[in-house]
Structure formats: C-alpha cells, structure tokens
C-alpha cells in the first residue's frame, strides 16, 4: 500500500482502493505504513460489493427473519464466521446482530474459503460475506442465502430478499472498490482519468461481466465526489469500529 515514497503523482501509477484499507483498517490497526486520508488522491468509484448472509442448506431458516428469531431464542449458542477481526464481514454482521438484538459467538477466520467450508461442514452456523466470494457456493447449492445487504435485490439472486425488506429499513452495507492515485496528481490528469474510467464502466458488456461476478457497478461523477464518499466511509466505519470496540489482535 505504501506507494507514496516511490511513485510519481503523474497519472501513470494507479491502484485499486477499497473500503478495508481506506476506511476500516486505519481505525483497527494502529501502526499502518500509510495515511489513508493524506497519501492518496481519489479518481472514482468502480464497484459496490453486496454481502450475502449465508447458512448451510440444512439450516431450517427460510429467511433472515427466521434465522434471527432462532438466534434470539438461543443467545450465544449459534456462531458466525467472518474473514477476520475488524474486517467488513465482521463489522457488517456485528451491526446486523446489534440491530436485531441477537447475540452470537464470533469465529474469525483468515479468509472466506475456510469460513464457508466450515459452514458447509456444520462447524459454524452462518457468515456475512461478499457476493463475489459466496455466489458460486450459493448457486451450486452448497450454501443457502438468506439475505443480501444492498437496498435492492441483486439480479443474480432475484429471490433472495434484502436485509431492509426483512425488518431493517435503510440497511445498506457492503464493500467498495475504486481507483486512486498518489497524492499530488495534477487535477487535470485526475479529472481525465475519472472521465475515461466512467466511460468504460458505462459499457453494458463491462457492467454485465462485473454483475456476473457478483459486483454492482456504482460510479461517482467526479474525483471530488469520490473523495467525499471516501471521507464519509472513513468516518462511518470508524464510528462502527469504536462502537463495537474492535481492536487488532496482531
């Protein structure tokens, strides 16, 4: 992530920024080798990554309401797997459980694959993970999706209701990816890159391909708009980290 010392801000060095390194990790890890607010210049938003709440196909819950009712009836007897402490998966689940008044035991993993495998194997109960990571398992029948985290249902899984539809109006959480550059890039180059990127993202073929992978194309009209979004995300995720007293373990 530390490109600020070696890369010239001339538009030839670009990178993908994401909600975790740009908005969450600065609040979880005290000794990062970059400053998410000062070291990078925004270009534009690329995609939003919906999260799917998934369980084993053997789980009797038909939807999120059923699942949360069971969790509330058995406090701290069900488990939720995540991709690690302080990850988006962890925080999104924590927010949902708090809103529902349900208590479950957190089981952090080092990634999606093992977390999903243990749900299939019955070692954990549920996980909230990106659609990109879990879509294939859902479509193959190895996992059952009970809810999607975005305000609207997703085209790839039209029968899966949103969290908002199931008792939590306004619920809209997920991860995002965007294009960023080293701080100091000339505004004219910054604006040109944003325009060119948005032209590509308007292509129906590109949008369809990203949709097939489980990502939603969301764009920002200008670098300034993306910068404002990143600032809001930084502050919002920081508040969540503080509310749940999330701290790095390594």
Residue ranges and their predicted role:
Residues 8, 47, 63, 108, ...:
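Conserved functional loop/turn residues at catalytic and ligand-binding sites
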Residues 139, 162, 187-250:
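An extracytoplasmic/periplasmic, membrane-proximal ligand-sensing/linker region
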Residues 1-3:
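Short, small-residue-biased leader/transition segments that mark boundaries at the very start
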Residues 22-31, 95-99, 126-160:
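A ligand-binding cleft/hinge motif common to bilobed small-molecule-binding domains
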Residues 11-17, 125-129, 144-147, 237-238:
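Paired acidic/hydrophobic, glycine-rich loop segments that form the ligand-binding mouth/hinge
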Residues 5-13, 19, 27-114, 163-165, ...:
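Hinge/capping helix and adjacent helix->loop/strand transition within the periplasmic-binding protein
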Residues 115-116, 134:
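Short, hydrophobic alpha-helical packing/hinge segments within bilobed ligand-binding/sensory domains
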């Amino acid at each position: 992530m530390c490109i600020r010392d070696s890369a010239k801000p001339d538009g030839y060095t670009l990178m993908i920024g994401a909600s975790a390194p740009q908005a969450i990790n600065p609040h979880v890890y005290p000794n990062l080798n970059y400053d998410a607010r000062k070291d990078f210049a925004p270009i534009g938003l690329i995609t939003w990554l919906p999260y799917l709440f998934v369980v084993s196909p053997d789980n009797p819950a038909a939807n999120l309401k059923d699942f949360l009712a069971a969790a509330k009836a058995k406090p701290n007897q069900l488990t939720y797997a995540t991709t690690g402490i302080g990850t988006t998966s962890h925080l999104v689940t924590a927010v949902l459980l708090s809103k529902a008044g349900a208590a479950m035991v957190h089981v952090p993993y080092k990634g999606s694959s093992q977390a999903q495998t243990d749900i299939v194997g019955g070692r954990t109960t549920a996980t909230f993970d990106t659609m990109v990571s879990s879509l294939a398992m859902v479509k193959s029948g190895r996992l059952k999706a009970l809810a999607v985290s975005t305000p609207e249902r997703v085209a790839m899984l039209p029968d899966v209701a949103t969290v908002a539809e199931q008792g939590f109006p306004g619920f809209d959480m997920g991860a995002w990816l965007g294009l960023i550059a080293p701080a100091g890039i000339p505004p004219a180059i910054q604006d040109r890159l944003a325009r060119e990127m948005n032209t590509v993202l308007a292509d129906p073929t590109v949008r369809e391909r990203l949709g097939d992978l489980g990502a939603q194309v969301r764009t920002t009209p200008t670098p300034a708009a993306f910068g404002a979004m990143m600032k809001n995300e930084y502050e919002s995720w920081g508040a969540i980290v503080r509310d749940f007293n999330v701290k790095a373990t390594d």
